Amino acid sequence: MNQFKEIKAEQLKGNPFRMIGKEWMLVTAKNEEKVNTMTASWGGLGVMWNKDVAFVVLRPSRYTKEFVDNGEVFTLSFYDSAYKKALGYLGSVSGRDEDKIAKSGLTLKTMENASFFEEANTVFICRKLFYQPFKENNFVDTSLIPNYYPEKDFHTLYIAEITKILVK
């Protein structure tokens, strides 16, 4: 753990639009027996309820969603471009079917009951505050539905307090 140092949200150097949308992130959560992770490129950072927060959206079919739903904390972690292949792999296979973490080549770490990977350059440890499933009748721009939800598998939105930011 000595590679990471804790910073305040105001000290974050990365651009969240690039970090999340272009470089991707891993959403990682654990239960008593297992850790699961998935690659995500949708989400955001901000302030809500006077707290620094992250928001992510997870589809009901994603195995990681079960871990996020059943736990109090999860992490968002970000990587240098050298890890893009590993992130692509982690986003394309399910932890239900194989030990994808072992096959990814990434090194699992745990801090404060939150799991993430040693290879990350930035880690947000997040505590869930709120969740809300998307509902079809709440879409103002209904053209999004056929493009992003042809199977009606609407995301669930999670808002989480960022309790710690770790950087290398």
Q: Where on the chain are the PLM-derived regions?
A:
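Active-site-proximal mixed secondary-structure blocks
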Residues: M1-A40, G44-K168
